[in-house]
Amino acid sequence: MKTKNFPLNKIAFACTLLLANPVAWAEDQFDASLWGGGSVLGIDFARFNVKNAVLPGRYEAQIYVNNEEKGESDIIFADNPATGRAELCFTPKLQEMLDLMDEAIVKSPNAEDDTCVFASEAIPKGTFDYQGGDMKLKLELPQALTIRRPRGYIAPSRWQTGTNAASANYDINYYRSGNPEVKSKSLYVGLRGGVNLGNWALRHNGSFSRFENHSSSGFTDKGKNHYERGDTYLQRDFALLRGNVTVGDFFSTARIGESFGLRGLRIASDDRMLAPSQRGFAPVVRGVANTNAKVSIKQNGYTIYQITVPAGPFVINDLYASGYSGDLTVEIQESDGKVRSFIVPFSNLAPLMRVGHLRYQLAGGRYRIDSRTFDERVLQGVLQYGLTNHLTLNSSLLYTRHYRAGLFGFGLNTPIGAFSADATWSHAEFPLKKVSKNGYSLHGSYSINFNEIGTNLTLAAYRYSSRDFYTLSDTIGLNRTFKQFSGAYLPEIYRPKNQFQVSLSQSLGNWGNLYLSGQTYNYWEKRGTNTQYQLAYANRFHILNYSINLSQSIDKETGKRDNSIYLSLSLPLGDNHSADSSYSRSGNDINQRLGVNGSFGERHQWSYGINASRNNQGYRSYDANLAHNNSIGSYRASYSRDSLKNRSTSLGASGAVVAHKYGITLSQPVGESFAIIHAKDAAGAKVESGANVSLDYFGNAVVPYTSPYEINYIGINPSDAEANVEFEATERQIIPRANSISLVDFRTGKNTMVLFNLTLPNGEPVPMASTAQDSEGAFVGDVVQGGVLFANKLTQPKGELIVKWGERESEQCRFHYQVDLDNAQIQNHDIQCKTAE
């Protein structure tokens, strides 16, 4: 709800009147004699004899219909000659927001005519109540006259386009390592940004990388500067489509079927346009670093994330949500140069949909892998439909010159869990080999939650039953290889045959939490089966947190079996600090680690970690890291060294640069939709809608994330702004579109508080309720009891003021003044106000 910062002079004025003249109220009669019958100010006080009376004008209010909030809007009150008081005008904007049946409205407003249509006449069966103190407008009327909408519904006409602006996210990681024999350094810069013009949004993401290696023998390997382009596209939404149109380089966002890169056109639905109550993921990456290590995450061959982590377990839970499938490859480069990697499965299973709801995508264009675009033209259509409350139908078609595929499946919700299954048929042609392959793939999954006992079971089986089943990427890749080598070369390609996954999580109450997972998979062209198991348990003993992780990996083709155990302990050391210890064993390798970490600062904007580790072979390492978060981004640094004389240093920074009509603002990394705040002269005020965000010197700040097609509340805490800055409101509402950049302008004024203790030449104080204006006729303040003029509207540091308590020359006086408008403190001056002689 919007709040007001009321001017100090108005509060003082009202308080002075009440203290000076105790009033006995009877039958809601307003005693106009307090103000000289109103003649002094030219105000008709009779209107205030009516309950909840209001002056004509424009106001901001929260709109409610039968106690259901509809949102925030400007409302207009105008004098009604028939009743002799100001009444609410029924404007086109208000009509749209109330969302009533046609039968409820007997007189509609005309958008091209400014004549006020009074709400009492337009909706005779409704009762309007404006509560000025709470800034609320409430309408009560029969429920049958309201349109039944889902909870949280917002009319598309209220979606806000936002402002023209540009933004660029950056994620910089500099890594330097070396020993007496080899030294290396690398630089990674991830970029994600674009430009907004009207309803259109241009977006691009990519990464720049560079590395250098130097050996003691004099050999130097200076890698080339490399920029890897990701997506570059133009997009806008359309309410009529309940979706968006995308043109350029993008990934198909199919939740079922195959996902791939295209350069072309896509039309797809967007469930976020639905009301929140009608709406139906990037995975969390977990791992363990033995030393201060660089972690890179890749999807579909493209680096999407890179960070330096200290020794010990790490969790990465801030990956950008991805609308397409593709396992994540996680690479861990230790400070001694060793590189380990593992796979995090990521497959977007088609969820169940509400009855009657439709999700679709139609995409076409040239096939694209990473930064390369090929000649093959691809057309894909995806359709999902909620047939009943329990059954969702899924279908997909994929077509190119040498490849066709079709998918049909269903999602089934039952009392014993949720099932999904689909079958895919494929036809792949290899012209240079003069062969074609027809194959099929079957897939099924099952999941169930036992909330009563805290059990979650997910069973997913992927089975490729046919040797001749090929995906689109398989087919295009093989055909290009055959063409490159004139059909003489047959590359070895591993195509999945069977894959089975199962995971179980169990809450044991005070006994902790248990997690079990396993997967097994094999390939047509490869003998043997790969199997992985993982068992994890976590609990707390008094203030000591502990966990244990057991895992096993078996490769039957090579006969290799890898067993590992990981044990961790964490002991709090007061508020926001802890000591951590871990023990891990993998095969014959044993590692132990001890560390201290925590956060500090008024808003915990600083964090640190210090670690020491060793293994059973005498290897020892030490590392330290420090990070800082503030309004303009986050910064990190780390250093490590070991007993093998390896040393590494890492520096990192992430944030955003936003260009807009009020200038350029540095920010924390921004999301798909975000908001720019501007409040003139309010530098230092905290933004309540963003962590560790304050207005900069120019009165600008960025709220890094907003939710599209929903009401977002943007608030400011003015306590850290200058004392003489006055906010008209400290909270605003916005309803941004997807990919929009909202501009939230908080109107402010510099309330330089100057008190003039005015006396007339005869020694009497200037009459209370007098008004003062400057030489240009602009209002500067009111006179309260004792002849004190609250002059908070001064615009010039010196000049002449005219004080009036009537229209006659004898009811006026003048005086000259000189003050400091930059002084935020209250200034007090004793002055004689001269009357006409």
Swiss-Prot record:
It is a multi-pass membrane protein. The keyword Nucleotide-binding does not apply. Residues 1-26 form the signal peptide. Its main location: membrane. The keyword Transferase does not apply. Essential for piliation. One of its GO terms (cellular component) is cell outer membrane. Belongs to the fimbrial export usher family. The gene is hifC. Keywords: Cell outer membrane, Disulfide bond, Fimbrium biogenesis, Membrane, Signal, Transmembrane, Transmembrane beta strand, Transport. It comes from Haemophilus influenzae. It is found in: Cell outer membrane. One of its GO terms (biological process) is pilus assembly. Disulfide bonds join C813-C833. GO terms for molecular function: fimbrial usher porin activity. This is Outer membrane usher protein HifC. Gene3D superfamilies: 2.60.40.2070, 2.60.40.3110, 3.10.20.410, Outer membrane usher protein FimD, plug domain (2.60.40.2610).
